[in-house]
Amino acid sequence: MNIDKALNVEELRGRFLKHTRLAYRRLPLLEQPRILEIGCGPGQQTIELARLSGGEVVGIDTDPSAVSRLQKRIDQANAGDRIKVIHVSLFDNKFDDDCFDIIWEEGVFHLLDASKCFVECRRLLKPNGYLVMHETILWLESTKIRLPDFGFKLMDEHILPKHSWWTDYGAPLKDRIKAYRDEHGNASNSKKLSQYESVVASIESDPDRSDCGIYLVRRMDGYGQK
């Protein structure tokens, strides 16, 4: 059984699209921008970014199943002229220098080498382009001081309501997992379900650590670089 579908995890993640919209509206008005989404997954944000921007969105992800799901969405929406998805990592891409107006990531950079991420994003962004990062506030604050070293300047931020990831994601997911186990008994045991239980336990144990924000930083040529 597809655990994601059984738990309707996509609906829970979709609750955070409102923050994607609010953050996007803080950007300056760009006419049909070219956007790169890093770690696009099955594409909820990808589709939303295409709708918000009216431009072209390229999603990249290292998970082939997520790429396949997004490609199916693109085909169903007949949106292949504006949305593309590629199975590749940020560090193995073949994109030209200075080719994106906006780079967007949600919950990816904290899993990677931040320095390498910033170097590659600077290469890919056009001059004065924007990098938008949705991460925990703890990660963002600890990383903010390093932004000038890579030629980036923090321009704006959108802070999510306190404990949003518990209220809108962890708590309802915990209830859905319990209901699923109650219904299916021993047959409910699966690696994916256990992974979700670990995520829920992590958020529940310290909701403050999961509080998130979205930083909008700009490539500034000659600004603060070492």
Residues of each region from the PLM?
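A short acidic, Gly/Pro-enriched loop at the edge of an enzyme's catalytic core
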Residues: 91-103
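A short SAM/SAH-binding and catalytic strip from SAM-dependent methyltransferases
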Residues: 102-114
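Conserved Class I S-adenosyl-L-methionine
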Residues: 160-226
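Class I SAM-dependent methyltransferase SAM/SAH-binding core
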Residues: 42-91
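Conserved class I S-adenosyl-L-methionine
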Residues: 32-41
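Class I SAM-dependent methyltransferase Rossmann-like catalytic core
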Residues: 2-15
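A short glycine-rich, Lys/Arg-flanked "PGG" loop and its adjoining helix->strand segment in the class I
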Residues: 115-130
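Conserved alpha-helix/loop element of class I SAM-dependent methyltransferases that forms part
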Residues: 13-31
